[in-house]
Swiss-Prot record:
Transmembrane segments: none annotated. CDD domains: RF3, RF3_II, RF3_III. It comes from the Bacteria. GO terms for cellular component: cytosol. Keywords: Cytoplasm, GTP-binding, Nucleotide-binding, Protein biosynthesis. This is Peptide chain release factor 3. It is found in: Cytoplasm. The gene is prfC. GTP binds at residues 22-29, 90-94, 144-147. Belongs to the TRAFAC class translation factor GTPase superfamily. Classic translation factor GTPase family. PrfC subfamily. One of its GO terms (biological process) is regulation of translational termination. One of its GO terms (molecular function) is guanosine tetraphosphate binding.
Length: 531
């Protein structure tokens, strides 16, 4: 273990690695932009809605995202903030892209939950919070869009507490909303920060009024709003939870901030809280033991593979979360699944689509390894030790289509493209044992569009979909070899191999699946599979 004075300890302790979770349109991409702006990582924050201009948001860089204005793939951005170095993992905001998002949440130590204050808790936020629950991830909450008419702030906090089962501790409190939005009162600092709208890359000077009873406050926001603020705060402070860092770190309590990302207001208050309270890199469970971030030997795992980040290079990048130790250019690593030593000299770090060669990186950082088809999601890299990090899920798809070619001569390219897209988690592919069909499985409809669009632009293959009689899929395994062979013989017409050659049962109806499970109780039918 390390003494807390070593340079390595200093580097690791200033890392904060987090992801943003929200319902589509709650303002997540705008928040991402503004977080980077306050971290001085970009000078011009491009808003996604500016369709006509070339200024697409920095974190949305794939062609299809540029057209639709939604974040379809996870990007990684690193920037300094105060004394910390922040790694922000941007997750797909569109409701369909849950698998990629779920896996990204395995690579972070905390999350920022963005809620549209006009709408409250929405469906996608509920689902993502369930995933963060699996690892008790600490959550910071940002109530967004205060420059619009919003719901009652007390109601919003009650809804978060009741629906998401997490206690709320307000850190800032809004003064008015919509056209009447005047700013926030910072409960911990006992000061009012007045709102002046900043747009794009303008960070406005803040006017601060010290103390809740300061007569300046009445002059600045008007006597009525000032009186309302004092009244609300008396209620709020009596009824809500005090901030407790231990409960926050256990994922049981969330600090709540109010603001408007579009107006560049409140994002810095939230960042101050996040960098102060969120944990530095956390220990991680491997099958063999728990790995601490303070260990000096390198370990890391692949949580995502992204093809063709750079159309000029036609490359694929494996995103590795470093769990412990230091990556140094040119170092040797053990690719555990293959039992192979590899020399890594060209890992990259990210500023959303802008890649820089990494000289070194530390626990908590994300690096990109060039991948020529040998790296898969869930792979572990170490400095020699044989370890397998656990908890990186694959989910059974909920939607299925048969895919076929307009030009039958391109079957080879189609298969290659589909296998690569399935390795990076964009889609799942099933090849039935009894015919030459290719069945594509997805968690959401938009994934199908993405696959066709990427097959065309990256593999020059024109594919079309047809309906297919598949309701669900389950991965199957059995400890009794003899019984498994018998099961395979009897169910040949329902079996398929996925992109990684794992056997799956393809059920035309849920009734069929239930019957198959009843008839073969010794066979395990799994809805998720560890990578």
């Amino acid at each position: 273990m390390l003494m807390s004075t070593t340079p390595y300890f200093g580097e690791v302790s200033k890392r904060r690695t987090f992801a943003i979770i929200s319902h589509p349109d709650a303002g997540k991409t705008t928040i991402t932009e503004k977080v980077l702006l306050f971290g001085r990582a970009i000078q011009v924050a491009g808003t996604v809605k500016g369709r006509g201009s070339n200024q697409h948001a920095k974190s949305d860089w794939m062609e299809m995202e540029k057209e639709r204005g939604i974040s379809v793939t996870t990007s990684v951005m690193q920037f300094p903030y105060g004394d910390c170095l922040v790694n922000l993992l941007d997750t797909p905001g569109h409701e369909d892209f849950s698998e990629d998002t779920y896996r990204t949440l395995t690579a972070v130590d905390s999350c920022l939950m963005v809620i549209d204050a006009a709408k409250g808790v929405e469906d996608r936020t509920r689902k993502l919070m369930e995933v963060t629950r699996l690892r008790d991830t600490p959550i910071v909450t940002f109530m967004n869009k205060l420059d619009r008419e919003i719901r009652d702030p007390m109601e919003l906090m009650d809804e978060v507490e009741n629906e998401l089962k997490i206690a709320c501790s307000p850190i800032t409190w809004p003064i008015g909303c919509g056209k009447e939005f005047k700013g926030v009162y910072h409960i911990h600092r006992d000061e009012t920060i007045l709102y002046t709208s900043g747009q794009g890359h303008t960070i406005q000077e803040e006017r601060i009024i010290k103390g809740l009873d300061n007569p300046e406050l009445d002059q600045a926001v008007g006597a009525d709003l000032a009186a309302q603020l004092r009244e609300e705060l008396e209620l709020v402070l009596g009824a809500s939870h005090e901030f407790d860092r231990e409960l926050f770190l256990q994922g049981e309590l969330t600090p709540v901030f109010f603001g408007t990302a579009l107006g560049n207001f409140g994002v810095d208050h939230m960042l101050d809280g996040l960098t102060q309270w969120a944990p530095s890199p956390m220990p991680r469970q491997a099958a063999e033991r728990v790995v601490e971030a303070s260990e000096e030997k390198f370990t890391g795992f692949v949580f995502k593979i992204q093809a063709n980040m750079d159309p000029k290079h036609r490359d694929r990048i494996a995103f590795v979360r470093i769990v412990s130790g230091t990556y140094k250019q040119g170092m040797k690593m053990n690719h555990v699944r293959l039992g192979k030593q590899v020399n890594i000299s060209d890992a990259v770090t990210f500023m959303a689509g802008d890649r820089a060669r990494a000289e070194e990186a530390f626990a908590g950082d994300i690096i990109g390894l060039h991948n020529h088809g040998t790296i898969q999601i869930g792979d572990t890299f170490t400095q020699g030790e044989t370890l397998k990090f656990t908890g990186i899920p694959n989910f059974a798809p909920e939607l299925f289509r048969r895919i076929r070619l307009r030009d039958p001569l391109k079957q080879k390219q189609l298969l290659k493209g589909l296998v690569q897209l399935s390795e990076e988690g964009a889609v799942q592919v099933f090849r039935p044992l009894q015919n030459n069909d290719l069945i594509v499985g997805a968690v959401g409809v938009l994934q199908f569009d993405v696959v066709v669009s990427r097959l065309k632009s990256e593999y020059n293959v024109e594919a079309i979909y047809e309906g297919v009689n598949v309701a669900t899929a389950r991965w199957v395994e059995c400890d009794d070899v003899k019984k498994f062979e018998e099961f395979k013989r009897k169910n040949q017409s329902n079996l398929a191999l996925d992109g990684g050659d794992n056997l799956a049962y393809i059920a035309p109806t849920m009734v069929n699946l239930n019957l198959a499970q009843e008839r073969s109780p010794e066979v395990k039918f799994r809805a998720t599979r560890e990578h």
